[in-house]
Amino acid sequence: MQCTSCGHDNRDTAKFCENCGRALHEPRAPAADPRTYTPKHLAERILTNRAALEGERKQVTVLFADIKNSMDLAERMDAEDWHKLLDGFFHVLNEGVHRFEGTVNQYTGDGIMALFGAPIAHEDHAQRACHAALHLRERLRVFGTQLERTRGLRFAVRMGLNSGEVVVARIGDDLRMDYTAQGHTVGLAQRVEQLAAPNSACVAQATATLVADYFELRELGAFPLKGVSEPVRVYELQGARRERSRIDVVLARSRRGFVGRRAELGLLEQALNEALAGHGQVVGVAGEPGIGKTRLCLELLRQCDARGAVFAQAHCPAHAASVALLPILELLRSLFGIRDGERVETSRRKIQRALLQLSRGFADSLPLVFDLLEIADAQQPTRMPEEQRQPALAAFLRRLVQAQSAAAPLVLFVDDLHCINPEGDALLGEIVEALGWTRTLLLVNFRPEHRSDWMQVSYYKEVAVAALPDDDADELLRCLVGEDASTDALRQLIRERTGGNPFFAEEVVQSLVDHGVLAAEAGSANPQAGAALPRAAPPLRLAQPIAELSIPPTVQALLAARLDRLAERDKLVLQAAAVIGPRFAPAVLQHILEHEPATAGARFSAEAVAEALAELGRVDFIRRDEVQGDCAFKHPLTQAVAYGSQLAASRARLHVGVARALQALHAEQLGQVAELIAHHFSAANWTFEARRWRRRAALRVTKIELGRHHRP
């Protein structure tokens, strides 16, 4: 099969070009020099997104990649051949970055700079970047091997990754535009790239901390880098951890004990009992990010072995929408016991034995299953036409569920259903239709905004998971921190700031350990910075005073990704509300959005603001006090992230807008809001106005005190 990119003749079974690494079966895009323009899809996104035009603060992972000794290569090649090599090289880079929804935002002559987490925030930006780096390493190894075989040239690429906060914005005008990131995070990623050996990828400590649970890393040491005050610890990215999914990570971290959720667990146990009795059940566990949905489901699944049930699980990663049928394939691998890295012959034997034990009638389905799991015999092509494959797979899944549940009770678990793609969701619907009168429980979890059509069946139940009550949150923090008296006030502060969200609490505690604020008592082993929380946390003590809790990057990325999924209007309204404060009056919000040139120049009608607030309430960002009429952020950290994601200039405009709105809406009682007006002018660095309104507030207090003094 000939590659449309470089013209190389490949084997018929090849999925990627053995010369340039480009995916086969894809029509080639019109030739263009990718270094001269912003990609069309990104330009459209930026031009229609006010935040992208004005700029935002985002948590991202930056990836740099370039050709090692590119000048030597260029000197040894004809200019036309060198251009052709670069064309193939950049196509490989683009494919690898876009595969994991990254953005190639700069071409550096012989390499690229890519962003993961901008312009669209991703909660797993560091994992995506590492997956992309490993994918590129393999594709470029093939590319380099072919170049060495045909031309005798040594071709090697090095990559560097770093994670942190950057300012992302448009540079230039609408006709010639670049979208880029600026900040210390970017420069450090480039420095780390220069430390990488040929055909390898290095990550800085910030990235390593975010991905250590999911990837194999080899520590290279701490290096003094230009522009960095302290040596930076650097790691080589070696590969993804075998048999290590998000579910495995949650399970490993859950060994500290299960806190609360007794009522919710009781509902799940009731559904399991009904399924075991032959009344198939589908249960959806719904809740906001980090609230403990997966942990609750795993607590139920611990009972499967004891109840004699066969169990299979799948996780939908955040990039699952770009991978066809991913959760369905994961369910099949889990059900048949297929392990990563095992020989394909072993996998085929496992599947054949399992299916034929259920029914000899499954013999005709073996080629389909082998093809789906990419373990078919290369000498015996079995791929059926695409228009036949989907119906055949649907029929196979229905038969499999019925046959397996007849042999033994079947429990299927799909984690993070909100990330599933339409094809996978449709096939999950086929399973749902088939399990009604079987001994099958399908357990899924998802975020509140998700809906699937198959949730209309009569045997579907939904369990809502809310924030932990204060008593349970206190118990969780005692498990994480201990009960040393020095941590009493800190534990209360963590509980208040994290709002009963278990994941947020765990990440804040780990961040405090990493920064040396919490330390083990004398004689106990100190938790390792950047590592997962210890299985049984030793009693921790307060090692240094703390005035304010910072938001861990993991939590910030998760909340920022959720904000970015909002419609633009709703996101802008939420950001404006965040400037007002954790609690805000809709009238003040309406005034600044309707009358002030705030939020990138946007103005909104009263109707538009009301609609936005209703939608933000529906998706659990805010709550409305029906008695007082005020609104409040449901979670304190959401307000902090929505506030912190805005540039200082944008926040300043909004603070001035709030101050003016308070003056307009409280013209008859200015003394009562004088201190609040002063606060907003001060936050905008309007020093003169801030002092004037503070004097007015002080004068009011003085008058009140004098009145009390002279009261008979």
Residue ranges and their predicted role:
Residues 24, 138-167, 191-224:
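A short beta-strand->alpha-helix segment at the C-terminal rim
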Residues 29-47, 174, 228-270, 369, ...:
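Conserved adenine-nucleotide phosphate-binding loops and their immediately adjacent elements
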Residues 79-80, 86, 92-102, 256, ...:
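Phosphate-binding active sites in nucleotide-utilizing proteins
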Residues 195, 204, 229-257, 284-291, ...:
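Short secondary-structure boundary elements
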Residues 324-414, 439, 455-458, 463, ...:
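Conserved Walker-type P-loop NTP-binding/catalytic site
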Residues 427-464:
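Sensor-1/coupling segment of RecA-like P-loop NTPase cores
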